[in-house]
């Protein structure tokens, strides 16, 4: 049965043949120091964050990644402003090395005073030559060009719309001023057995249509409907 490595044991996780932590601890001689370093990094970066950072590199680079994370975390605790890079630049790398040794022993790390961290010699990150914030990215240039093109297109559309409205306005006024000639046509529609004489131009309204019933003894059940439609100018 394969035993778990010291890193997986303190993290209380299963250790397999493809363990990411086991090769990272080979440069540390003591088992207690391996456990202390793993617990310290798990508290600083988080358990999931530590595993993700270790798994980003290939297998032969994972020990170097583990050591780099350890020195960076210790340097950040000693100098919260500039970290391990600031300690290296200011000539105080021995403070970072002492912090790493304290972590191996399980002792607390003592940070430097805030005044000393602020007034100390800072790395040249504030130099304009090293600052890349003034360099505009290609995506920003594309966005600016697209915004300018959209504004020009909107202006052209608004101008064309206004010109079309100005051309349409006199036509609409002419159409409103024209009046159709008022002509009245009277139609007379007749429906019956007997034709209506052309000389009679009487228009029978709809409400006054006559329903006449013949009173002869021969056709008692017959009805006569007269509907008149006369055309008159």
Curated annotation (Swiss-Prot):
- Tissue note: Expressed in roots and flowers.
Q: Where is this region: Disordered?
A: 143-183
Instruction: Provide the GO biological process annotations.
Output: response to gibberellin
The biased composition feature labelled Low complexity covers 161-175
Where in this chain does the record put each LOB domain?
A: 3-109
Give residue spans, biased composition: Basic and acidic residues.
143-160
Q: Its domain of life? A: Eukaryota
Q: Which PANTHER family match?
A: LOB DOMAIN-CONTAINING PROTEIN 38 (PTHR31304), LOB DOMAIN-CONTAINING PROTEIN 40 (PTHR31304:SF9)
Could you say which protein family the record assigns here? Belongs to the LOB domain-containing protein family.
Q: What is this protein called?
A: LOB domain-containing protein 40
Q: Which organism is it from?
A: Arabidopsis thaliana
């Amino acid at each position: 049965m394969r035993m778990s490595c010291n890193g997986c044991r303190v993290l209380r996780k299963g250790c397999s043949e493809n363990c990411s932590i086991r090769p990272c601890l080979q440069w540390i001689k003591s088992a207690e120091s391996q456990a202390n370093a793993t617990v310290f990094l798990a508290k600083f970066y988080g358990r999931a964050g530590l595993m993700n950072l270790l798994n980003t590199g290939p297998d032969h680079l994972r020990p170097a990644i583990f050591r780099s994370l350890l020195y960076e975390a210790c340097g950040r605790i000693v100098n919260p402003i500039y970290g391990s890079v600031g300690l290296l630049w200011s000539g105080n790398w021995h403070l970072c090395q002492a912090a790493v040794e304290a972590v191996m022993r399980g002792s607390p790390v003592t940070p430097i005073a805030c005044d000393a961290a602020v007034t100390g010699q800072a790395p040249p990150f504030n130099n304009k030559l090293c600052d890349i914030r003034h360099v505009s990215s290609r995506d920003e240039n594309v966005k600016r060009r697209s915004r300018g093109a959209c504004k020009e297109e909107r202006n052209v559309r608004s101008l064309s719309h206004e010109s079309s409205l100005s051309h349409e306005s006199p036509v609409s006024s002419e159409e409103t001023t024209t009046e159709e000639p008022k002509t009245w046509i009277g139609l007379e529609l007749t429906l019956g057995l007997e034709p209506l004489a052309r000389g009679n131009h009487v228009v029978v309204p709809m409400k006054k249509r006559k329903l006449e019933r013949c009173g002869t003894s021969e056709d008692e059940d017959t009805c006569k409907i007269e509907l008149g439609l006369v055309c008159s100018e």
